[in-house]
Amino acid sequence: MSTKKIAERRKSRAWSGPWLRACAVLVTVPLFASCDDNNWCGNCGYPPTSPSEASYGLVAGNFTQNGHTSVIATSTVYYYPHDNPGNLKIYPSTGAGTFGAPVLTPDGDDPLYLASADLTGAGPLDVVSASFDDGTLTVFYNSAQKPGTFGAPLILSSPGASQVAIGDMNNDGLQDLISADFNVSLFVQTAPGTFAKPMSLYPGGANWVAVGDLNNDGIPDVALTDSVGVKVLLHTGAAASLTYAAPVAVFTQSVNPGITGANLIAIADVNGDGLNDLVITDPGPVGSPPTVNILLQNKSAPGTFLAPVSYTLSATSFPQSIVVADVNGDGHPDIVIGGSAVVNVLLNNASAPGTFLAAASYATTNATQVAIADVNGDGLVDIVVPVGVSHPLVSGVYTNNPGVLLQVAGSPGTFAAEKDLP
């Protein structure tokens, strides 16, 4: 199966959450069993009775440099199944747990996942958006003079882009971009704000990529999802060489004829041994719930991994985003997995780091991309998702605002019910 088909299937399956929600909000009709690119909101009609906003990607961080969390989500008003102009919807922090009115910045058509990092070394966090329909990565540079505002973006051609990872791939102090596109394109930053022509790392293409040192040589490697499962590309030679060994398969997706190329990957040292491990979701075979799988790096053979240990996720959750971070403040990385209607949280077992407690599931409107950040300034990290619980009608468009699951004070690692971003 081609990478294009893989990505289209993933996008189609992913849209079953936000587009189905849009149908339910827009008109007084039942929820439909099928609602994707090939079936424009079922009986909602074409175009829909009223245009609707869909939000898929999201990042959170100190974008305004005021010490508080701001939130940025993708925003697309859907008039047609494809090629709808998108925006970044920026919610600037005005204090602990307070936000200004959202500001729109034009993005590519139907933007999907976002990533953020300081790309230029100027201090403020920048944002990168992946657009499968446009076949682009769009780089938004945060103003060092007025943090939280973004000028004209840099657009990079990346056919098939569905997601992007950021990392300094050649250890030159500049952050580079790795696109989950038809070629797994590596965009090397040659000077602040300037990228070389892309290198193709894996012509078979990928639907998800992650970067991190996977063999303990101090140089980032690449993990990717293809139609079969997960492969690892280990860097070889000096950092500046940007050469990689042949891809090695480390995980095979469960057989599910309706879903291929659906693994998500995160790279982190989950057991505290100084070696990065792999955290991989799997949608599961037909009739079985999805899982998250831990592949610990083999101490005696860096760059290889032990057999996966599997943990069951909510049966109603199709995994669409993954974050590994310490959410309960015990110093051990935990796992947060977002889906169309559920967030799963797996806490690392402090008594046996690298093993995890059973997943706790939290209902959400839409968690296609999750972010971990302290939203209300209480010193506890919260879970932020692209779509909250209300959908106000604004100028004839049913809109979305991000949602947040606040961490419960006095109960580390547990979260309150979703509510709209304040």
Model-inferred region functions:
Residues 36-53, 92-109, 141-159, 188-204, ...:
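Blade-edge motifs of beta-propeller repeat domains
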Residues 56-65, 112-119, 162-169, 207-214, ...:
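Beta-propeller blade termini
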Residues 71-75, 127-130, 177-180, 222-225, ...:
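Hydrophobic beta-strand segments that make up the repeating blades of beta-propeller
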Residues 1-17:
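N-terminal secretory signal peptides that target proteins for export/translocation
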Residues 31-34:
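C-terminal motif of bacterial Sec signal peptides marking the signal peptidase cleavage site
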Residues 86-90, 136-139, 183-187, 229-233, ...:
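A short loop-to-beta-strand structural motif that recurs across blades of beta-propeller domains
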Residues 76-82, 133-135, 184, 229, ...:
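Short glycine/acidic-enriched loop and turn motifs that connect beta-strands
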Residues 68-69, 123-125, 173-175, 218-220, ...:
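Glycine-aliphatic tripeptides that mark coil-to-beta-strand junctions in extracellular
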